[in-house]
Curated annotation (Swiss-Prot):
CDD domains: Peptidases_S8_PCSK9_ProteinaseK_like (cd04077). It comes from the Eukaryota. Glycans are attached at N133. It comes from Magnaporthiopsis poae (Kentucky bluegrass fungus). It is an enzyme of class 3 (hydrolase). One of its GO terms (molecular function) is serine-type endopeptidase activity. InterPro entries: PCSK9_ProteinaseK-like, Peptidase_S8/S53_dom, Peptidase_S8/S53_dom_sf, Peptidase_S8_Asp-AS, Peptidase_S8_His-AS, Peptidase_S8_Ser-AS, Peptidase_S8_subtilisin-like, Peptidase_S8_subtilisin-rel. Residues 1-19 form the signal peptide. This is Subtilisin-like proteinase Mp1. One of its GO terms (biological process) is proteolysis. Its EC number is 3.4.21.-.
Length: 404
């Protein structure tokens, strides 16, 4: 049953912006927790030696107190980093290392979802028609996404939901001591828009769930390091299975701008793994947030049924395209495994574009991340979004190219 859902997870992220996002994010730093990115070209041996050195420095520090040292390690082709909890003395030694490119604080990340009431699933009509207010989804059956994969970095997935017809799998849980299940609903809703049999853009695509939000958190928040852990797993899994040309990473979440996370997104892009990211719900410049600000992510803002930019949507030149993000109906969690509900947010706009990536990959056979990005921008409907005045945003709506 479609009903009213409250998933406004962090009020500061959904209210109209009255101050610069730097001020908004200032209270979102995880105490004593940092992400350290090494300079490009670090060998496996030098990385191992660096980590050993950090461990020694931390153990010798008389002021380490409750800090735990290195916690997570991130090792992708073109991106080498680690996260952990360090005292000031250890951190200072790390910063002085010639091997270190930059150090940044770990930050709190949020899901980009708001509250809404019942409505119609108009989003599929929007991406298959140039004119607004269509509720018919027109598509080429060859673009349904069979043998293609959506890696959804989110809250988990109801794999038994009827929308997914057995195409959903549980890939990686960044909270190993917590059950791999979607008790929040956000990840299931996103997955339904990408690949659900009723609500999905790419209705036959497979779903790989990467869980980076814990159900035990009242505020439903995560951190840069935890999300980066899930992202790194997804990149490695795609690479190991040779799925670069058949996959997309979908991220309906974000936090304060992170150079480390943006570097990881770029490393994935250079390996032909495309990331689609939500612009954010702060009604502010998306360049202040990650992964929205990653240069080669496809960053998605939200519009309503009349092609008006949503009041909450982040904006600016880092946004690549707009998509339906107001009153979006999709799959939801529940004991019947057949629930559905309606939500607002750039979280809801993003999976429309993630699904479109898989649709175009399966239909037109794009092998590179750059090629499918260019195709989405070329197909988009130009100059029909209103409410963009003064935002320096592209006036472009995602479109699948089927109708005139």
């Amino acid at each position: 049953m479609v009903g009213f859902k409250t998933l406004a997870l962090h009020l500061a992220a959904v209210l109209p912006a009255l101050a610069a996002p730097v001020d908004k994010q200032a209270t979102q730093v995880v105490p004593n927790s940092y992400i350290i990115t090494l300079k490009q070209g670090a060998s496996a041996a030098s990385f191992h030696n660096h980590l050993s050195w950090v461990g020694d420095v931390h153990r010798r520090s008389v002021s380490k107190r409750d800090t735990t040292g290195v916690d997570k390690v991130f090792d992708l082709d073109g991106f080498t980093a680690y996260s952990g909890s360090f005292d000031a003395a250890t951190l200072q030694e790390i910063k002085k290392s010639d091997e270190v490119a930059f150090v940044e604080p770990d930050q709190v990340w949020d899901l980009y979802t708001l509250s809404t009431q019942s409505g119609a699933p108009w989003g599929l009509g929007s991406i298959s028609h140039r004119k607004p207010n269509s509720t018919d989804y027109v598509y080429d059956p060859a673009g349904l996404g069979a043998d293609h994969y959506a890696y959804i970095i989110d809250t988990g997935l109801d794999t038994e939901h009827v929308e997914f017809e057995g195409r959903g799998t549980l890939g990686y849980n960044a909270y190993p001591n917590s059950q791999f299940i979607d008790k929040i609903g956000h990840g299931t809703h996103v997955a339904g828009t990408i690949a659900g049999k009723t609500y999905g853009v790419a209705k036959k695509a497979s779903i790989v769930s990467v869980r980076v939000f814990d159900t035990g958190s009242v505020t439903r928040q995560s951190t840069t390091a935890i999300v980066l852990d899930g992202f790194s797993w997804a990149v490695k899994d795609i690479t190991a299975k040779g799925r670069q040309a058949k996959s997309v990473i979908s991220m309906s979440l974000g936090g304060g701008r992170s150079e480390a996370f943006n570097a990881a997104v770029e490393a994935a892009y250079q390996a032909n793994i495309l990331t689609v990211a939500a612009a954010g719900n702060s009604a502010w410049d998306a360049s202040q947030y990650s992964p929205a600000s990653a240069p080669n992510a496809i960053t998605v803002g939200a519009i309503d049924v009349d092609n008006v930019m949503a009041w909450f949507s982040n904006y600016g030149p880092v946004v690549d395209v707009f998509a339906p993000g107001v009153a979006v109906e999709s799959a939801w969690i529940g004991s019947s495994h057949a629930e559905h509900d309606v939500l607002d947010g750039t979280s809801m706009a993003t999976p429309h574009v993630s699904g479109l990536v898989l649709y175009l990959k399966s239909l037109e056979g794009f092998a590179s991340a750059a090629a499918v990005t260019d195709r989405i921008k070329a197909l988009g409907t130009n100059d029909v979004v209103t409410g963009l005045e003064g935002t320096d945003s592209p006036n472009l709506i995602a479109f699948n190219g089927v109708t005139a």
